[in-house]
Regions:
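Conserved class I S-adenosyl-L-methionine
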Residues: 1-52, 68-71, 153-188
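Class I SAM-dependent methyltransferase SAM/SAH-binding core
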Residues: 59-61, 65-114
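A short acidic, Gly/Pro-enriched loop at the edge of an enzyme's catalytic core
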Residues: 113-124
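A short SAM/SAH-binding and catalytic strip from SAM-dependent methyltransferases
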Residues: 124-135
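A short glycine-rich, Lys/Arg-flanked "PGG" loop and its adjoining helix->strand segment in the class I
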Residues: 138-150
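Acceptor-substrate binding/catalytic loop of class I
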Residues: 199-215
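A C-terminal cap/extension of S-adenosyl-L-methionine-dependent methyltransferases
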Residues: 217-218, 228-298
């Protein structure tokens, strides 16, 4: 990973996510249908280790286009949401999604390490795949503690584990090797039209860290949280996901058949459910690609 200053990390994240916003939902198969809502419910339940309660007011950090916060509202788990992101482009996409879904969401362009929000304002602070983008995750967790009401819950999910990230290199390499044959099989050409405005050239710079389970737990405790728990999620699903995503990223997006995208999405979800039944809670958290951490403000 390239070594960047904190200011450079923030600048790269803004430019990458602003550029990627328009095609982000299509690239990552983000949806707001019943299947997606159930998936987000499972992610939250997995992170908490129990069925989630209903939260009155939630803050999402790194909200992106609304995959987590909007699905939580649609699922009836959150009443009010403030969606925060450093990227105005992502929040514009989120606002369009919210309008289409007839959801009322407040958006806020802000740095997760310095939130322009009053103390003790939220019942839930949640983030998905954001801590590994931040120059100072400890500072962000301290801000989460500050803006949570006493008894409030913090949840971060989708953070890459050190071991899981190494294991993911194998399906990524396999995808690169087999991509030409796969493209011929589905009748798609290579993706030769990635413009600099899309932010694709910056994608390798925005992921600046991986975590160990003990490290994540220590960060949350140091921020002042009680009842801290770190859990691992997705083993087989992760390997399948990185392989299928690697194939898709090699092809012109408009030429990838809908049937393939549906197969990839359903395959990922089926393996995620298998992981949940067979492996999660039984194997060490560090073996999984995705780590979650949760805690409670005293």
């Amino acid at each position: 990973m390239a070594v960047l200053t904190p200011a450079e990390v923030r600048d790269v994240n803004v430019r990458y996510h602003d550029g990627a916003a328009a095609g982000y939902d299509a690239k990552w198969s983000i949806d707001f249908d019943p299947l997606a809502r159930a998936q987000i419910r499972r992610k939250l339940e997995s992170a908490l280790g129990e069925p989630p309660p209903r939260f009155e007011h939630a803050l999402e950090l790194g909200a992106g286009t609304g995959y987590v916060s909007l699905n939580l509202m649609l699922e009836g788990l959150v009443t009010r949401t403030t969606a925060s992101d450093i990227s105005a482009g992502m929040l514009d996409a989120l606002a369009r999604n919210a309008e289409r879904l007839e959801l009322d969401v407040q958006t806020l362009v802000a740095d997760a390490e310095e939130l322009p929000l009053p103390d003790a304002s939220f019942d839930l602070v949640i983030g998905h795949a954001i801590l590994h983008h931040l120059p100072d995750p400890a500072r962000a967790l301290a801000e989460c503690h500050r803006v949570l009401r006493p008894g409030g819950t913090v949840v971060f999910a989708g953070e890459p584990s050190r071991i899981g990230d190494r294991l993911a290199a194998f399906p990524k390499r396999a995808a690169r090797a087999s991509a030409p044959l796969w493209r011929r099989a589905i009748g798609a050409g290579p993706d030769d039209n990635r413009s600099p405005a899309s932010g694709h050239d910056l994608e390798g710079l925005v992921d600046i860290r991986v975590f160990g389970a003990a490290e994540l737990a220590a960060l949350a405790r140091a921020a002042g949280f009680d009842d801290v728990a770190v859990r691992g999620r997705e083993l087989l699903a992760n390997w399948f996901g990185w392989y299928s995503r690697g194939l898709e990223c090699s092809a012109a997006p408009a030429q990838i058949p809908w049937a393939w995208r549906r197969f990839a999405a359903r395959g990922y979800l089926a393996l995620a459910q298998l992981d949940q039944r067979l492996f999660e809670g039984r194997l060490p958290a560090d073996l999984f690609y995705n780590l979650s951490v949760c805690g409670r403000r005293p």
